[in-house]
Amino acid sequence: MLFLLPAMLCADQEYLEVTASADRKIALAVAPPVSQGGGENSEITRNASDALRFDMELSGRFTILDATRAGGISGIRPGEFDLAPWRAAGAEYLIKSAYLLNGESTIMEFRLYDVTSGRQLLAKRYSGKNKDARKMAHSFSDEILLLQTKEKGPFTGKIAFVSKKSGNKEIYLMDYDGHNVQRITANGSINLNPDFSPNGREIIYTSYKKGNSNLYRRDLFSTAEARISAHPGINITGRWSPDGSRIALALSKDGNAEIYAISKDGRQLTRLTRTGAIETSPAWSPDGGKIAFLSDRLGKPQIFVMNANGSDPYRLTTSGDYNVSPSWSPKGDRILYCRQHSGGFQIHSITPDGNDDLQLTSEGSNEHPRWSPDGRFITFSSTRGGGQSIYVMRADGSGQTRVSRSGNSDSHPVWSPRW
């Protein structure tokens, strides 16, 4: 468990917002954490520094300087160190941090400085286990984005994904940057399409562990699990509604695959499409009023949008012969999907009215796009570099970075709400 202690300082928010609003990236130095007592721990130093640098680089707002020790290893509070060496190294902003060890527990303190003016902009202190150093750093990164943009970052979130690292397709969980991987399922079968509940405590997923492709709901903190949809045929591509009360999914209990909505306990079922075509992969709009989905009602797979009660469907994608895997931005302004190109799939982003279609990827075959909870980043799977791995990128397609390292067919990522 990670605890946020009372904030020590939060100053000059207006100044940081104005500075960060420019297109130019800010030169940022990240000083390695220093010990304030209880001994030294090289893992804390390395993990916190690496996490901060990764977060700030992905944010797209900073250029990370290779000047980690420009100012030596002096203190972190105002007046305890000299900003001049950092200024000489070209830093505009500086993150300083320290830790206080007490056995397996630690208190970490982070501070953000404007090197040019000498002002401290932000300070936070966290308490947790030594192994939580990365999470503490991610929490501070979230606060930096909050200070810049008035919205917290998504860096404390997790990514659930499917991997064959055990030999079968099982569900795993990892930090969004690929660290702290843990296995969620261990049934030796095929498990697919994880999706987080809005509060992040539960996931739903499809499993063939009983022979049929049934939908399950699992509590990530207690491991309690319930089978919520086991109709004959497929029970696949489940997605939580934004309020957590319903789940949209595809069922083939009456023949072809159609879109349904069920209550989260599986007791109430409502059919939403009735076309006789194959229709799967529902994706809710953030207000819960609409659903994007895949349909071949016109002969080839395309993305459609309908009201959440199934009424007034319209075709979203009009280019490409094979478009799949819609994902609606939490901001409501874009929908991701995958289009088949020569050589594989590529991820596109389009407005809900079908305009401004942008191709975001080009290297390898790229699938399963999902948004971060703030809508500023995307996670997806890609075959670039051999095998299939999980990547993250910014919403405009820049900053594409590999985060999973198993090399064992990692796919179907989904980014959790903030933990």
Model-derived regions: residue spans:
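Amphipathic beta-strand/beta-sheet edge segments enriched in Tyr/Trp
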Residues: 14, 77-143
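Short beta-strand->alpha-helix linker/helix-N-cap micro-motif
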Residues: 15-83, 95, 99
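Structural motif
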Residues: 105-107, 167-172, 212-216, 256-260, ...
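Residue-level detector of Asp-centered blade-edge/turn motifs that repeat once per structural unit
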Residues: 153-155, 198-199, 242-243, 286-287, ...
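Hydrophobic beta-strand positions that form the internal "hydrophobic ladder"
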Residues: 159, 203, 244-248, 288-292, ...
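Multi-bladed beta-propeller domains
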Residues: 175-192, 218-236, 262-280, 306-322, ...
